Amino acid sequence: MSKNLLIELGLEELPAYVVTPSEKQLGERLATFLTENRLSFEDIQTFSTPRRLAVRVSGLADQQTDLTEDFKGPAKKIALDADGNFSKAAQGFVRGKGLTTDAIEFREVKGVEYVYVTKHEAGKPAKEVLLGVTEVLSAMTFPVSMHWANNSFEYIRPVHTLTVLLNDEALELDFLDIHSGRVSRGHRFLGTETTITSADSYEADLRSQFVIADAKERQEMIVEQIKTLEVEQGVQVDIDEDLLNEVLNLVEFPTAFMGSFEAKYLDVPEEVLVTSMKNHQRYFVVRDQAGHLMPNFVSVRNGNDQAIENVIKGNEKVLVARLEDGEFFWREDQKLQIADLVAKLTNVTFHEKIGSLAEHMDRTRVIAASLAKEANLSAEEVTAVDRAAQIYKFDLLTGMVGEFDELQGIMGEKYALLAGEDAAVARAIREHYLPDAAGGALPETKVGAVLALADKLDTLLSFFSVGLIPSGSNDPYALRRATQGIVRILDHFGWRIPMDKLVDSLYDLSFDSLTYANKADVMNFIRARVDKMMGKAAPKDIREAVLESSTFVVPEMLAAAEALVKASHTENYKPAVESLSRAFNLAEKADASVQVDPSLFENEQENTLSAAIQGLTLAGSAAQQLEQVFALSPVINDFFDNTMVMAEDQALKNNRLAILSDLVSKAKTIAAFNQLNTK
């Protein structure tokens, strides 16, 4: 008869961002433990709150399944001595399996007889196996851990309770400094310690103590309560998904409520108000039916609605203090001059090994000018890029950004517009931070995109030049994100800027503040980001083939990878790649100084292939270019079928290799076809 298992780990308050991943990890690790220990089950349900992680297994088998395993030992000639007795090798083998030589039998494998033993292991009762389940808890990994009391061990947070129930039976286990039982803790303020009656009564037992153990249920409660407030008040609430996920992991018993603030604060830019409410206070933003910000907010209390009016007043008071700061900085910052702030950036350190922010901006300005030409920007756009590059970090010295650093760039745009700067310049100041996260929004204007590229390129080159290069998962200066941003921007705007030539030109620049170094490392780092951009959709061989192409143009490389992936599912892919691979491999033996001489052609196939290569224009999309190259496959095969490339005559051999070299020089702009796998 199957049983239900409950494991609950009661902890001190967990950081909100840790709760959901830890809940998932616990379920996965327990499932692995049960599977590895041959305990079948029907379902696993996980639970979490800020003060507990729990999992319930339904339909757990009473005992392990029996195990029968065959083990192969030494060959018969080694297992028996000259007298036909079992040798020490055979005896040691069976002893290692917990058996005797009586269990030995011989089986033939590919004409050779070997020792085999069969071991039968009866399944243990589930209760006995579960005595080792604390290894699941010990194996849990967390982004941070801590010591407490005088203990030598560490964990995400101090552990207060451990409950392990098999149906209604409490298992006796020890974990860290805690002995298991059936007592759990209720809500910190509304509940008390409570006894968990059985695995099945878990949610009900905690609910009686104002704890909703199921995170999905808490989320549904929050959303439903907010929707009710929307209807009652005739408003719209921005239910931001990230904020919702954070809030549900801050509360055990959610109660949503609406508060308000004075309408005068609506004169402050919306971004300031939203940042104050959402990022600093974890409040949901409220709008009218037209989408305009209202002087209200929605928050979620960790508790019931008892004395809710006092809670609302307290939350309003805290928010008003934030809004007062925002209003003050908004008013005072407008008294500042952009030129004065830019001048002060000489005293702001970009990095102690690299120099000041002003020096970083100077280098960025030079790079931006070069990129503007490469991207064929208009004269007006070039002017806007140059002006933006001169001032784009000024808002870092404003009071608003000093208080709300999330608003860097955003306030720069607003203050620039108030100061009379061109709209394109102001917008570029905001957009140069983009993308600010993996998959985040990209700049929408060419001016902003060029400034973003220039800023990220100098950041990348500067940190690499002083040896601050990411290693493993360590990337304290977010250089991977910056470089991924470079790749995404180039692809989004379709700018066919050869990265190798661009980086070469940047390394030729001379700055008093810094000399760029470690160019090879920079190029490999950029290639790695292009590789990541190709993603899982492109197999490793296709990614490597594209990365070894002769043209390091990001949009073309990504398009080539996509075209090759699609082509790999067609019937002509294998023969085309095989013929091209043969050509690529032979061309490696070519003398680069030798040009094709038609007078040395000895057959029509040489002439036909050479002419086809000369006529190969590689126009159109990546898919069309690939189709043009693949179309040469029959001509290449005909050439190989009728021509001895590695002829004894040196002149003939060099000429034929030169034909193949011409083919490779064109085809390699798409990919190194000899890196592709056709097996």
UniProtKB/Swiss-Prot annotation:
Its main location: cytoplasm. InterPro entries: Gly-tRNA-synth_bsu (IPR015944), Gly-tRNA-synth_heterodimer (IPR006194). Its EC number is 6.1.1.14. One of its GO terms (molecular function) is ATP binding. One of its GO terms (cellular component) is cytosol. It is found in: Cytoplasm. It catalyses: tRNA(Gly) + glycine + ATP = glycyl-tRNA(Gly) + AMP + diphosphate. Pfam families: tRNA_synt_2f. GO terms for biological process: glycyl-tRNA aminoacylation. Disulfide bonds: none annotated. Keywords: Aminoacyl-tRNA synthetase, ATP-binding, Cytoplasm, Ligase, Nucleotide-binding, Protein biosynthesis. PANTHER family: GLYCINE--TRNA LIGASE, CHLOROPLASTIC_MITOCHONDRIAL 2, GLYCYL-TRNA SYNTHETASE. Tetramer of two alpha and two beta subunits. Belongs to the class-II aminoacyl-tRNA synthetase family. This is Glycine--tRNA ligase beta subunit. It comes from Streptococcus pyogenes serotype M49 (strain NZ131). The gene is glyS.
